[in-house]
Every structure is written in structure tokens, then in C-alpha cells.
Amino acid sequence: LVGVGTFDDGKGGTYQLPIGWNGNSNGFRSREEGGINQYDFNVAFNVEDRMYFGITLGVNDVDYTRSTYYTEDLYDGSHSGFYEMRNMYRTEGSGINLKLGAIFRPIEESPFRFGFAIHTPTWYSLTDVYSSEIYSELNYKYENEDDNKQFKANERTIDYAGEGVQDYRLVTPWKFNVSAGTTIGGMMALGAEYEYANFGSSRLYYNDGTPMDNQNEYTKSTLKGQHTLRVGMETRISSAFSVRAGYNYSTSAFKDGAYKSLNANDMRTDTEYTNDLARNTVTVGLGYRGKWFYTDLAYKYDVYKSDFYAFSDAALQATKVTNERHQLLLT
């Protein structure tokens, strides 16, 4: 629990240092709900069964809520105490984008094909609503130097920052995709694709269209291009059943030393942030195709590591987190 003090340097100037008590233990909890729902509207056609073209209009609906709780026990010699901080954050809005793609089968007698796709940025119009609450209890113990008596004092503080509302626009990066695939003997299908997006090129604007220059420079300095590789195969083991397997690898979109930036006059106090590292995803599945009925069963395993920080501090060591997700999907 610190503040910043201004001190005289003895030479007619001043300098600043953090002041306060040392935290000797802390805890953090976070709850997230919602996300982004996307609705796609597609048009596709082919030329002589050799060239295939498609366009997709994507409409995104955003409804995301996050609440966090941070607590820290404090100790400074004979003084002690604790504080608790709660943050509530919600984002609502909508976005729109286009996806353009083409697939070519260059040799008529061969099943080999290759393709490419371009995804435009998603143009979002968003509203953030946030609030915070802090509770602290500090116990002081000190001596009166005149009569050498000890005194104790207790201080309780409850502060609530009312709701803050921010309307703004977000433009996500372009995405570029190339792919290739073939079939072997009519029994096995193989495919691979590569995708690139430079998240450092994301842009924020005020609701009137004015660029947020400081935030955009910060985005450019902390985010980078992300590379994604996907490979997959499907084998027909009988006239009705097929087995599938796939692998997805994505590099981190965060540069080394990336941090969360809050302005000094910002009402938000959710200082924690997480830098996700490379992500690995493995999928296996079984499919059934009958005359009147079909179904697919898949198992998906997703794992990636993260560096978690309760707040931005050059001396603060990251908390290493391993994230794992197991999903069983039936369609």
C-alpha cells in the first residue's frame, strides 16, 4: 500500500519516491462472463469446379462482464492492516467485418488445391462501464516520547468510485490466410493453413472519430504480429465412419515487457493484467455419415501459459500460470 512522496534534494530541486507499508501477502480472484457472438452471412460460387470464391459478412455482438477482487495484508514494524479492492467492468457493443476467400484446383486430374483469404478489420462501436470499491483497515501502534506510553489507533476506510462510462471505437487488424490440401486414394484428406495478424496495428478512436494517439502508440509498443499454423487430417475407416485429428499453434501477440497502461486520472483501478504466451490446441474426433442421419463427436484440448501481474511494477515478478481447457463437442 503505497503513495508517492515528493522530497527536497537539498539542491533546490525535488525528487519522488514511493512511500507506504510493505505488503507481506496478497490474493486475487477474477470472474468473467460473456464474450463475442458472431453471425455470418455467406455467398459462394465456383467456376467449372476448379475455382471457388466466397464472401462472408460478419456481424459481432459483444457482451462481456468481468469482476475482480484483490486483497493485501500490510505490515510495517508495529503497524499492521489490510485492504480489499473490488472492480466491476462491462463492455457492450457491436462490430462488422468482411472475409474474402478463394480456392483453386490447378490440375484437373489432381485433388490438390490451394487457397487464400483476407479478413478485413472488425469495426467495433463499444461502451465500457466500470466502477470500483476499496475497503481498508489499518492498526497503528506508537509511543509518546514524553511519557513513554504506548498508544493504539484503528482506522477504517470505505471508498466507492461511481460508475464511469466510456464510448469509443476499435478497429482490429487485418488477417491474411493461405492454405493447401489434398486427398489420398479417396480415403484420406490432408490440409494445412497459415494465418497472420499484426495486433500492434489495432487502433482506438473516440466516439467522434478522433484517434486516441497515446493509446495507439502504447498498443504499437506492446503488441506484435501473431502467427498461427493449423494442420489436420481425416480418414474414412468404413463407409459410414471417419476419424479426424488436428493441431493448432499460435504465437504470443505480446511483446516482451508488455504492461497494462492506465492514465493517472483514470477512474479504473483494475491494475492486474495477463500476458498470454504461445497456445497449443489438439483435436481428435469421430464422425458418422448415414443415409438419413449424421453426427460428429470431438475432443478438444487447449493449453497455454501466461504471465500474471497484479499491477505494473518493474520489480514485480510475474506469477506463472498454466491454462488448460478440455472440451467435448457433439454436433
What are these regions (language model features)?
Residues L1-T331:
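Outer-membrane beta-barrel porins/channels
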